[in-house]
């Protein structure tokens, strides 16, 4: 959000609506409440709207769970799991996810912050919590290596046996000291080579329990393009201000 702010500000000052794919923009108030308020004020002054969206965050691990909760009288816990393949992605993603690194180099990258892993858990947790009326008192996330036992090669990535084929991201949102939102997101190149099948899964504990399974995964690249394009008319027709997927049809 902070890195994207100046670009968004420039566009808004030209009286143009903005749809951003920056992950943190999906629910920027989760980590940047003051900057979010500034963007909202700026958008209203110029009569335009700002929205951040994508496939994840933006749909598969947040909005979809929120929509599914609409058939429930009581929600006790939300678990979202997205198992996806990194194979279609290019060199930048391979580097961000640590594909091809030794385990030691991967762990060093996690410690010094040079590996991005998945970005957006804080925003997804914040969006779900806002929709369900929960107050998150603690958020945590973890990042661990997925080590391959066979050589794996994708168009832009290579990991030899014993090295890192991807990253397993996990995150938790706590309410009153209890994990109420659980996020699990393993992503790797050529997952099928070791029997891992991609998919999107949501479990909502409560009354009645909801268990959703989509296999294979919803394609991240095409899905993000579709989300952005499909939201354009809604952003154009929205009242001015900073919006999230909770605000729009």
Functional labels for PLM-detected ranges:
Residues 40, 44, 48, 69-73, ...:
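Generic secondary-structure signature for well-ordered alpha-helical cores
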Residues 53-58, 220:
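Active-site nucleophile and cofactor-binding loops and adjacent substrate-binding regions
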């Amino acid at each position: 959000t902070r890195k994207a702010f100046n670009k968004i500000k420039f566009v808004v000052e030209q009286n143009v609506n903005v749809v951003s794919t920056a992950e943190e923009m999906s629910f920027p108030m989760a980590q940047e409440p003051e900057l979010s308020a500034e963007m909202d004020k700026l958008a209203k002054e110029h009569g335009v709207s700002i929205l951040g969206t994508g496939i994840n965050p933006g749909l598969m691990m947040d909005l979809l769970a929120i929509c599914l909760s609409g058939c429930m009288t009581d929600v006790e816990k939300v678990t979202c799991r997205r198992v996806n393949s990194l194979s279609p992605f290019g060199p930048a993603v391979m580097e961000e996810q640590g594909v091809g690194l030794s385990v030691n180099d991967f762990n060093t990258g996690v410690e010094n912050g040079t590996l991005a892993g998945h970005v957006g858990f804080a925003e997804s947790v914040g969006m779900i919590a806002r929709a369900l009326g929960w107050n998150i008192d603690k958020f945590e996330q973890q990042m661990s290596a997925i080590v391959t036992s066979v050589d794996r090669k994708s168009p832009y990535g290579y990991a030899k046996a014993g090295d890192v084929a991807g990253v397993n991201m996990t995150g938790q949102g706590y309410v009153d000291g209890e994990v109420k939102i659980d996020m699990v997101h393993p992503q790797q190149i050529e997952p099928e080579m070791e029997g891992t099948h991609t998919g999107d899964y949501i479990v909502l504990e409560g009354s009645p329990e909801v268990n959703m399974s989509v296999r294979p995964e919803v394609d991240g690249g095409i899905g993000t393009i579709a989300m952005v394009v499909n939201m354009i008319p809604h952003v154009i027709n929205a009242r001015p201000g900073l919006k999230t997927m909770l605000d729009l049809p």
